[in-house]
Amino acid sequence: MKVGIIMGSKSDWPTMKLAADMLDQFGVSYETKVVSAHRTPQLLADYASSAKERGIKVIIAGAGGAAHLPGMAAAFTSLPVLGVPVQSRALKGMDSLLSIVQMPKGIAVGTLAIGEAGAANAGILAAQILGTHDESIMAKVEAFRNEQTETVLANPNPAED
């Protein structure tokens, strides 16, 4: 496994699945797991502290509400942690975003956008990180970016179908 995708609860999976979908597109192996910072703190500590020795290179952590999962995962590992704020009902994910982005100096979490765009971009960013040491992954990322460009160039007029 190259990427660990963790989330605070099973209800976060519909959002976090977009990270997995992007990794699938780039041929990057991953594992998924529910690891709650509040309900299973020891599981979180064990998961994050053992990730490197298990071959994980990047952790994508999605959480809503108080959203302590990404920061706590980062506290237990030296691996890059990408935080995805999962949209919440009460504050539409702003609470999650602020919880993830406001990390103390010395414990870094790369924070993505709220919700589905953030999860998809976390998958892309993880592939880009891995691609710095794996040309086959980087080639797939570059092909994806070129495809996006071609799609826009092929349909420049929004009034046309």
Curated annotation (Swiss-Prot):
Keywords: Isomerase, Purine biosynthesis
Gene expressing this chain: purE
Chain residues that bind substrate: S9, D12, R39
Purpose of the protein: Catalyzes the conversion of N5-carboxyaminoimidazole ribonucleotide (N5-CAIR) to 4-carboxy-5-aminoimidazole ribonucleotide (CAIR).
Protein family according to the UniProt entry: Belongs to the AIR carboxylase family. Class I subfamily.
Coiled coil: none
GO BP term (any one): 'de novo' IMP biosynthetic process
Reactions this protein catalyses: 5-carboxyamino-1-(5-phospho-D-ribosyl)imidazole + H(+) = 5-amino-1-(5-phospho-D-ribosyl)imidazole-4-carboxylate
Pathway: Purine metabolism; IMP biosynthesis via de novo pathway; 5-amino-1-(5-phospho-D-ribosyl)imidazole-4-carboxylate from 5-amino-1-(5-phospho-D-ribosyl)imidazole (N5-CAIR route): step 2/2
Pfam family, one: AIRC
GO molecular function terms attached to this record: 5-(carboxyamino)imidazole ribonucleotide mutase activity
NCBIfam families on file: purE (TIGR01162)
Record-listed E.C. numbers: 5.4.99.18
InterPro entries recorded: PurE_ClassI (IPR033747), PurE_dom (IPR000031), PurE_prokaryotes (IPR024694)
Name recorded for this polypeptide: N5-carboxyaminoimidazole ribonucleotide mutase
Phylogenetic placement of the source organism: Bacteria, Pseudomonadati, Pseudomonadota, Gammaproteobacteria, Vibrionales
Family matches, as SMART domains: AIRC
